[in-house]
A protein has these predicted regions:
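Cytochrome P450
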Residues: 1-424
Length: 424
């Protein structure tokens, strides 16, 4: 086991990720150069904590090892959890989604959910993204000064996910708040008054499950044009989702489909503001440049910082002996800055090709199911912004989420010249 004096604070602590970006980048480069596969200790848990004490985890910081682990799910399993700290058993009922499963369970759920995305459903999604983006700009265009994350970046994926699942608008704020609690665990802004983080996360899962059960019950036997209706009424080779499957899938959509797109859009405005030459290249030929620009935003933003796997057998990775049962964490954000893969990796380049990033996860069965939708949302949102608020820019520094799992932006001030609403 490699034993090298690593940077401080520990990479698995949220304190590592709320520092100046230059400090984070310097330390990630240190890991890639000096200890690309290295073991770090987990924090000591209080004796009364329901979280089991873990020995530690292997950190993968280079692109090559992350691809190798992603392509070998039979050796690097998702079923024991996807975060560094193990969850209390009672959490599994709400958070044991397909992302934390191996085949054949993972393949079964993914197959059923994929079947729900019919051509008609996909067309509805395309139309919905355009309409929602236009409505969002209408809601802010006369203000001239906004919190870009709250008013724009978060509003789009939240509305799309809720519409997709048939969730009534009356629940939108509740869904948004629960998402913040689950993924912002530990950030002071989202801490409950009593400081009990685990209870807050558990209760957020309970609320989301209740919302989904209510929606699913209302869709039984109906012919509504949403994914929940398709999933509760359709059977695929005598197989269908249970209510627990449906609830955990909804939670996955809320936290993955909502938060990751929100953070990509939020970081995207920051990158475009800091790199006006790249912004102009995109504006000059939006449709042609959009595919590479969106991939570059996702690469640098890396909305999901890492994913954990667990070794199912003794193995060798990056020259290190990994034992059966060891945790292995793939730090996507570091891999997306790997100097061996990306030329000038810290440069924001909207024309970057090739761009073999792992911002949607590595290759293999767990590649992001919603990658196509996320790309579409990012493209449409920036098209609408460039067209109607052409001088919009970040007017301050992002307020970064204090979390190690999500590379999040909580708030980002933005300014633009006010314009009138569209008459539609």
């Amino acid at each position: 086991m490699v034993n090298i004096e690593a940077p401080s604070p520990n990479i698995i602590f949220s304190e590592f990720w709320v520092r100046e970006q230059s400090e984070i980048e310097k330390d990630l480069a240190w890991y890639r150069s000096n200890a690309p596969v290295t073991f770090v200790q987990e924090p000591i848990m209080p004796s009364e904590s329901p979280i089991p004490q873990g020995a530690g985890t292997w950190i993968l910081s280079r692109h090559a090892e992350i691809l190798e682990a992603s392509r070998n799910p039979e050796i690097f399993s998702s079923a024991q959890g996807i975060t560094i700290l193990d969850s209390p058993p009672e959490f599994n009922e709400y958070f044991q989604s397909m992302i934390a499963m191996d085949d054949p369970r993972h393949a079964r759920l993914r197959r059923i959910v994929s079947a729900g995305f019919t051509p008609r459903m996909l067309q509805k999604l395309e139309d919905s993204v355009q309409q929602v983006a236009a409505d969002i700009v209408d809601n802010v265009c006369e203000k001239g000064e906004i919190d870009f994350v709250v008013d724009v970046a978060a509003a789009l994926p939240l509305k799309i996910v809720c519409d997709l699942m048939g969730v009534p608008e009356s629940h939108y704020q509740e869904v948004f708040d629960c998402s913040n609690v689950i993924l912002g665990a530990g950030d002071p802004e989202y801490l409950p008054a009593d400081g009990d983080i685990l209870s807050a996360i558990f209760n957020a899962g309970l609320i989301l499950q209740g919302i989904m059960e209510e929606v699913a019950e209302s869709k039984q036997g109906m012919n509504s044009d949403d994914l929940t209706t398709a999933l509760v009424n359709a059977e695929l080779e005598d197989d269908k989702l249970t209510s627990a499957d449906l609830a955990s899938f909804f939670i996955l959509l809320v936290v993955a489909g909502n938060e990751t797109t929100r953070n990509a859009i939020g970081w995207g405005l920051k990158y475009l503001t800091d790199n006006p030459d790249q912004r102009q290249i995109w504006v000059n030929d939006f449709e042609k440049v959009a595919p590479t620009a969106v991939e570059e935003i996702v690469r640098l933003a890396s909305p999901v910082t890492y994913m954990r796997r667990t070794a199912t057998t003794d193995t060798i990775l990056g020259g290190q002996e990994i034992k059966e049962g060891d945790k292995v964490c793939m730090f996507y954000l570091s891999a997306n800055r790997d100097e061996d893969i990306f030329e000038d990796p810290y440069r924001f380049d909207v024309l970057r090709q090739p761009n073999n990033h792992v911002g949607f996860g590595g290759p293999g069965p767990h590649f992001c199911l919603g990658a196509h939708l996320a790309r579409r949302e990012i493209t449409v949102m920036f098209r609408e912004l460039f067209h109607r608020l052409p001088d919009i820019q970040a007017s301050g520094e992002p307020d970064v989420l204090a979390a190690s799992f999500i590379h999040g932006v909580k708030h980002l001030p933005a300014t633009f010249s006010p314009v009138a609403k569209n008459n539609r």
